[in-house]
Design a protein with these regions (language model features):
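Histidine- and aromatic-rich ligand-binding microenvironments
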Residues: 131, 204-208
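Structural microenvironment flanking redox-active thiols in thiol-disulfide oxidoreductases
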Residues: 91-143
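A short local loop/turn or secondary-structure capping micro-motif enriched for an aromatic residue
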Residues: 71-73, 199-202
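Short, contiguous, helix-prone interaction/anchoring segments in small proteins
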Residues: 35-66, 74
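Short secondary-structure boundary/capping segments
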Residues: 42, 65-67, 100, 172-174
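Thiol/selenol-based redox catalytic cores and closely related redox-interacting motifs
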Residues: 135-201
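Short active-site neighborhood of thiol/selenol oxidoreductases, capturing the structured segment around
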Residues: 65-94
Length: 210
């Protein structure tokens, strides 16, 4: 199974080759500004009790964290949306891990602020077997300390590249979650966390000690 970091580096290389320099520079400046805000400091950490939630999955069915924890530990991945190639690489990485029986002792759940039908399309088009939940308004991501507001100059760039956040998320707040991965044990405690303002960095399944 290919390392997730290898996939992420390949995406960066492709972006450098195909995206105009001025846009790459804008992305770089945006990321630098967000990193300087130390957004990760607000996020829940190892040892914290994970807040419960009930969110609709890609079929509109409610999924409760605490109910799920009665049966298994839970891996939660907060991601930005199916318009983000780094997010897509992460989600397909988790599906590969499931296919290779690497996460049998945990239930994988992915959460994004986008609407249910976009999560449904994502799941069907990529043959994802795990639950993908819609966190409208980033309500749950905010409880986990992960929410930030995208800078105004980046919003139009995203839209021109096909990432119309008002359309995907059905709101005009331009709020997104910092990509984050948590492992929560059956006692509701966070036992692994990976949170990074740099959306090009993600936790590999091999980093999670199940």
């Amino acid at each position: 199974m290919k390392k997730l970091n290898d996939k992420l580096q390949l995406i960066q290389k492709e972006m450098a080759q195909n995206i105009p320099v001025d846009i790459l520079n804008a992305f770089g400046q945006s990321l630098h500004e967000l990193i300087e805000q130390n957004l990760e400091d607000r996020a829940l950490k190892v040892g914290d009790i994970a807040p419960d939630f009930t969110l609709p999955d890609a079929e509109g069915l409610p999924v409760s964290l605490y109910d799920t924890l009665q049966h298994n530990a839970v891996i939660i991945s907060f991601f930005r949306g199916n318009w983000c190639p780094f997010c897509m690489a992460e989600l397909t990485h988790y599906q590969e891990a499931i296919n290779n029986n690497l996460v049998d002792s945990a239930t994988v759940i992915a959460i994004s602020p986008q609407s249910i039908h976009f999560n449904h399309d994502l799941k069907v088009q990529n043959n994802l077997e795990f639950r993908i939940l819609s966190d409208k308004g980033n309500e749950i991501a905010d409880k986990y300390g992960l929410v930030f507001t995208l800078q105004e100059n980046i919003r139009e760039i995203y839209k021109n590249m096909g990432a119309d956040l008002e359309l995907f998320n059905s709101d005009n707040t331009y709020k997104l979650p910092i990509p984050a991965t948590y492992l929560i044990d059956k006692n509701k405690k966070i036992v692994f966390s990976s949170v990074s303002t740099n959306y090009m960095e993600r936790a590999d399944v091999c980093d999670i000690k199940l």
